[in-house]
């Protein structure tokens, strides 16, 4: 299945929440009408959505937020099931520790899609080695750096300025001048994906 390349607002409108697919340079309200579903006149409310439908929506929201396709998402879920602890929370931790997401959290990309592009274009190093796999799992203590030849890119400086004004998450430490950061630890569940009910995703895959 190909990665979605259509309008980002359409996905956020469909899920009725900000999926953080667009830069925060402008407020989401000025770009997307979240209270209006996709379609010429929006979808009218009908019968109550089934439990399965609600579970499916939560899964779609999570996949779209992190830019992960179904096959890969199932692998993350299987890995989360194998690990100790709460499966839903572990799933979100795995998604949060993807390299493209960490690059985004550090402010090197204004969106996860932009961060993914930086990785695929070999603009990022992990512990001194060039990394071009967006799904690479970053571990606590790993150092993420923008490569020297990429530091001149205006979009990276703009993204860092934006991240600094909004606030860089406490679970990463970033030197904006050196364009380098350390992934200190996994984030607390309460700090990420707040609009996601991961227990519904677990219920969906447990059917």
Curated annotation (Swiss-Prot):
GO terms for biological process: ribosomal small subunit biogenesis; translation. The gene is rpsD. One of the primary rRNA binding proteins, it binds directly to 16S rRNA where it nucleates assembly of the body of the 30S subunit. With S5 and S12 plays an important role in translational accuracy. Signal peptide: none annotated. GO terms for molecular function: rRNA binding; structural constituent of ribosome. This is Small ribosomal subunit protein uS4. GO terms for cellular component: small ribosomal subunit. Keywords: Ribonucleoprotein, Ribosomal protein, RNA-binding, rRNA-binding. Residues 97-162 form the S4 RNA-binding domain. Pfam families: Ribosomal_S4, S4. Belongs to the universal ribosomal protein uS4 family. Residues 31-51 are annotated as: Disordered. SMART domains: Ribosomal_S4, S4. Part of the 30S ribosomal subunit. Contacts protein S5. The interaction surface between S4 and S5 is involved in control of translational fidelity. It comes from the Bacteria.
